[in-house]
Structure formats: C-alpha cells, structure tokens
Regions:
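ATP/NTP phosphate-donor binding region
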Residues: 1-99, 369
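Short glycine/serine/threonine-rich phosphate/pyrophosphate-binding segments
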Residues: 27, 51-55, 82, 107-112, ...
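Glycine/threonine-rich beta-strand-loop-alpha-helix active-site module
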Residues: 83-196
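Carboxylate- and glycine-rich phosphate/diphosphate-binding segment that chelates Mg2+/Mn2+
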Residues: 167-279
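Flexible, glycine/charged-enriched surface loops at secondary-structure junctions
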Residues: 227-237, 252-264, 278-284, 338, ...
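C-terminal catalytic subdomain
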Residues: 279-353, 357
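C-terminal charged capping/lid subdomain of soluble metabolic enzymes
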Residues: 331-431
Length: 431
C-alpha cells in the first residue's frame, strides 16, 4: 500500500503542482493562497456545531494573513439546491470580493462554482440553464469578455473531487432532478485538502464518499478509448484509485479514527477527481441524478455500476481482466487466473460484477435498487426520461460505445430492471 500511496501523491503533484496542497495538517497554506488574489475574500463555511473547531482554525489563518472577510456565508444544503446557488450569487454580487474561499464538501464547493458563474456571467438574470452541459461557461465568458472570480476550495470530505475538478452539480428540488455544468474554467484556482479533517466523518458518509470517488475512476476507465493518447495516464490514475479504495475502505469502516486509512481514501478519491479532468462519467452517474430524493449520489452510483459492468462487458474485456486482479479476494476461488483468462467477455463481466457486489456486502453497502426505501418503478421511468435530456447527452457519449437518446429505452431499461432485482440475466449488451 505504501507504494500506491507514493504513486497517488506523485500523480496528484504532477497534475496540480503548487496549486493544490494535500496531506495531514496542511491548512496553513490557505493564507498564502488567498493572498495571491487580494486582501479580502468572501468566506463560505458551515455554521454547524461540527465545524466550530475548523472554523476557528480557518479564521485564525485568514486573520494572521491580514485578509479581510467581507461576508461569511453558510454552506449549501446537500446536492446543491438551485435556491442556495442563487442566494450565494446575490451575496457575491453585493460584496464584490477579490476572491471566494469555500470550506466544505462537494455540495458546498459545487454551489460556490455555480454561484460564481451566475454572479460573474449572468448578474442580471439568475438562470443557470445556458451553462449546463460541456464547455458552455468558457464559451459564454469569451462572448461577454468576462472572467470568473478566483475560487479557493478547502475540501472537508473524501469523495466528490469537486475541489480539483471541472464539474459542478445543481439540483432543481421541485423536479427532484440534478443537472451538471462541466467546464475546466470553473475548476478552483487553488485547493487544499487536509485529510485529518475527515476523521470525524460518520461511517455512512465515509462509505458513500469513497464509493463516489471509486465510481469516478471506474466509469472514466470504462469510457476511455484504449487507443487514445491519454489512455496510459487514465489507466494509471483510475486503477490506482480503485485499488486503493477496494483495499482500504473495508479496513477504514472498522477503524474510523485511523488517520492512515483516512489519508489513503482521501488520496484515492482525489485521483477520482483528477480522472474527471481526463474523461467523463457515464451510465451510473447519469442515472443517479434522478435518485437524489431517496439516496445519496455515491450510493446510487455504487449500486448501479456492477450492472453497467455487465452491460459494457463486451466492449471492455481487457479492462475487466485488470479489474479482476484488483477485486481478486472477492472472486470465487474456483476461478483461477487461467480460467478467468479463458472466459468470454460477458462471463468475465458477470464475474467482476459479482466481485463488486461481494465488496459492497463486505462494507454493508446496498447492492440493488429494491433495497432502498422509497424506490419504485416510477424511478426507472424517470431515469430513462432524464437520459434523453440533451443537457446530459455527454453521459451517453461517455459510454464505452456511445448510446443515442433513441436507444435508451431499448438498452438502458434492461440494465435498470436488473439493478432493481439483482439479476444479471438481461440479454442486451452495449455491442
């Protein structure tokens, strides 16, 4: 594991250089980061009781560096409701800060990204619709000859990778539907993740975050063309991330105060954030956007990905062989390396998917949609309809073999029905 930790650290340093500080007890660099953009900032940080010690530490650092806090704002609710984004955008417009400093998890940082876009590029109209999809923010910024405010992100939860990635979600609560902005221009200019901050995270939050990070790496690994120039880098980032989570998460769930395991999971999910800059997520992430009112995002992705593994299997056979090695301890011992090597793609996909489910069971994680309270068949219809939305088309294109909206009913519905019951016998494959 030490070698994997060193590899993860090197990959992250090669990616972000001096713009990202990570490790244990590394918050002090915040003052220098914020000072690069001016002598004042808008501070976003939770006012909940759990954050009191962290808030004091952040305030002390900013005061020591003579940085004026123009306003202090509470963090977004989970899943970044659009109302929270608009509220924050209005505060940004009224305070005119030199920078935005956001201390929080993925939802809080996503909210800061979204609000920055609104306040900077649409100050007279609180409408995010023009920015949804891929590359829309940069295009509009260039057309209007405007720039976003500098954003410094201080991550507090392992999982989303929002502090080092180009993605930002927002939820339309009335429709119970999540949407996505994906553009490298919204990536925070500076980021910090002191993994010791995660020591107090409860077990469910810890697991869901880790599985979210794993899903980023897994889906991007699946969707990246093995003949592409970047493939070797993608493979290294994704497989390092996945293997660290598969090895360390069961240990961490039994020892939540173990700083070594916390660091491993932090590094691994950070690699998932790095992966988001190298490629895009696909099926499970797409469907998770329609399940926000009954389960967390990470939980939805974790349940769905084994079934997409089977669906994608005929297009990713060589990738599955490497995943079989990572999940080896969760594979039936009767399957020797020689026997695994001789399996056809579909059988290999089922074997790896069953190993993923065995891993989930090891950490007391649900393995099918029917186990989730509140789930019913209407959610399958909702996921199918959302998959046809042009704003989410990139998720279909990111599949190992891209789907079009007109093929969603034929190919995606059987996968979702399988995920409902835990049955891998569906006939359709992606090719």
């Amino acid at each position: 594991m030490k070698e994997k930790v060193r590899e993860a650290q090197k990959l992250l340093k090669d990616y972000k250089g001096k713009d990202y500080t990570f490790g244990i007890n590394c918050l002090d660099v915040l003052g220098n980061y914020v000072s690069e953009f001016g002598n004042n900032t808008l501070l976003i940080i939770s006012n909940s009781g759990w954050a009191k010690p962290l808030r004091k530490k952040i305030m002390d650092i900013l005061n020591k560096n003579e940085i004026k806090i123009l306003a202090e704002v509470d963090t977004s609710a989970p899943n970044t409701p659009v109302g929270d984004v608009i509220k924050l955008a209005n505060i940004i417009k009224s305070t005119h800060p030199d920078s935005i400093t956001c201390v929080g998890g993925g939802s809080a940082i996503d909210c800061a990204k979204d609000a920055n876009v609104l306040a900077s590029l649409s100050p007279d109209r609180n409408d995010l619709e023009p920015f949804f999809g891929v590359g829309r923010v940069r295009k509009i910024a260039q057309e209007k000859n405007k720039k976003l405010l500098p954003l410094v992100a201080v991550e507090v939860a392992s999982g989303s990778g929002s502090h080092i990635s180009k993605n930002a979600n927002v939820t339309y609560t009335e429709k119970k539907q999540k949407k996505l902005i994906s553009d490298d221009i919204i990536t925070p200019q500076k980021a910090i993740f002191d993994y010791s901050v995660t020591l107090t995270a409860p077990v469910d939050l810890t697991i869901d975050g880790a599985i979210d990070g794993l899903a980023h790496s897994l889906e991007i690994y699946y969707g990246t063309d093995s003949s592409s120039i970047e493939y070797k880098k993608v493979e290294k980032v994704c497989l390092t991330s996945i293997s660290m989570i598969v090895d360390a998460l069961p240990l961490l769930t039994g020892d939540l105060a173990n700083i070594k395991y916390r660091e491993i999971i932090g590094l691994a999910t950070d690699l998932g954030g790095y992966a988001l800059m190298l490629g895009g997520t696909n099926g499970a992430h797409l469907n998770s956007f329609s399940l926000i009112d009954i389960m967390t995002h990470g939980r939805a992705c974790g349940i769905l990905n084994p079934y997409y593994t089977v669906f994608f299997s005929t297009a990713i056979k060589n990738k599955l062989k490497k995943l079989a090695g990572i999940y080896k301890k969760y594979i039936d011992r009767r399957y020797t390396e020689e026997r695994i090597a001789n399996l056809n793609a579909r059988k290999l996909g089922e074997l790896v998917a069953k190993a993923m489910i065995a891993f989930s069971e090891k950490i007391n994680f649900p393995t099918k949609l029917s186990e989730i309270e509140g789930f019913n068949d209407s959610y399958i219809d909702k996921m199918i309809e959302a998959a046809k939305n042009p704003q989410l088309e990139m998720k279909l294109k990111n599949m190992p073999v891209p789907l079009s909206a007109k093929l969603v009913d034929e190919y995606m519905r059987p996968v979702l029905l399988a995920a409902k019951t835990g049955d891998f016998s569906f006939k359709k494959n992606i090719v």
